[in-house]
């Protein structure tokens, strides 16, 4: 028996590419993305993603291998770094809005937490070592936006087949829309 999600849901949740494809397939919002490899057309991908991107291993956690790229050369370097951790590497447009994490316990969606990192982005250092990362609960969202985020988080969680408990991470894109990042089936309950 499991205290949370089973093996299949946990494996799916660990694969960011698979989750994004599942969410897109049912119309849930997740940022555009490109799968990168050594043959990638770096300038074309950078342009398609808006000129700035986050590059990450598709199957890694804790922001390991995550890099910001603002030029095609930086994207290629970021891909090489991320490829050290996973065979599949993805790039998404850089989203500079707020980051939220939403815990789910049984059928209850807990209040969202807004994360403010002093670093350029919420990386491994900011998550586990920085005394300057701040967590806000209540998150400051209006009741309507909080309800929207809670609904979205539960939909993302259930789409991946998760159960019991977990956490959904979301960012606000440059147009003010929520975009799903990932589901954590065994998270630290920040």
Language-model features, listed with the residues they occupy:
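Conserved metal-phosphate-binding beta-hairpin within the catalytic cores
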Residues: 93, 102, 157-189
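Phosphate-binding site of ATP-dependent enzymes
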Residues: 70-151, 172-179
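Short glycine/proline- and charge-enriched loop/turn segments
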Residues: 2-4, 128-133, 184
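Active-site nucleotide/adenylate-binding loops and adjacent lid/helix of ATP-dependent enzymes
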Residues: 11-98, 150
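Short hydrophobic/aromatic-enriched beta-strand-loop microsegments
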Residues: 1-5, 30, 111-112
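Short gly/pro/ser/thr-enriched loop/turn and capping motifs at secondary-structure boundaries
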Residues: 8-13, 119-120
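Short beta-strands and strand-loop turn motifs
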Residues: 2-6, 55-60, 180
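Glycine-rich phosphate/pyrophosphate-binding beta-alpha loops
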Residues: 63, 118, 184-190
